[in-house]
């Protein structure tokens, strides 16, 4: 199954802004992204909200618990509940992260990195294949933010992503802030990374802010998008063209008007990136 590109700008739907999205007389954004697990429930307010939002906006489902990097495999119960939500919402697409979250019943509640080895590739691809079979749709996988590397890494992250897509037919959700954070933490060139990502597999872009830790940049989603990430986004716009782009804010969430103004910056930066690409 082939997914169709969506050219638009959106926001992550968060509880402080539910009412504004539901009460607005006109659409506020081109699409919304929701955290899948927040709506994988049997009833109640979450399903009322997602049903109402779905009537007004295209919706992307974005998960944090699939754990495609786990040697334990992806849990079938989780996939079946996710499929139930996807069948209800009819989303633009379903995405999660290239990571693992736990092992042998332990849940770290974090997005842990996978080693970039052939052994890990086999695990990841088998888990993606199972997920796509159960969900009956292709997945988008997001590049992680990274704070450690593995001594036995056999390839760069962008090489791993490209091979993963080639083997499974999955797509990419390219997080520009994560690229910048990982590049800063590990000393690689984020623009060379962008240049190596397969153009035809990128369907969505995330934009977010980060914080400076004692030694590393941390992907905190509690700050506005910084100039360094905007500059990288312009380069991405020039390379990948019209793909869905959205801003994530998960902590210190500002008023919705502030995020809508930031989304206007995203539109302007995208246009600047496209102009630069056409002039080159």
Curated annotation (Swiss-Prot):
Induction: Induced by potassium chromate (K(2)Cr(2)O(7)) and cadmium chloride (CdCl(2)). Induction by Cr and Cd requires sigF. Probably part of the CCNA_03001 to CCNA_02999 operon.
SUPFAM superfamilies: Xylose isomerase-like
Disruption phenotype: Not essential even when cells grown in the presence of its inducers dichromate or cadmium.
Keywords: Stress response
Record's keyword annotation contains rRNA-binding: no
Superkingdom of origin: Bacteria
Pfam families in UniProt: MbnB_TglH_ChrH (PF05114)
Family: Belongs to the UPF0276 family.
Name of the protein this chain belongs to: UPF0276 protein CCNA_03000
Organism field: Caulobacter vibrioides (strain NA1000 / CB15N) (Caulobacter crescentus)
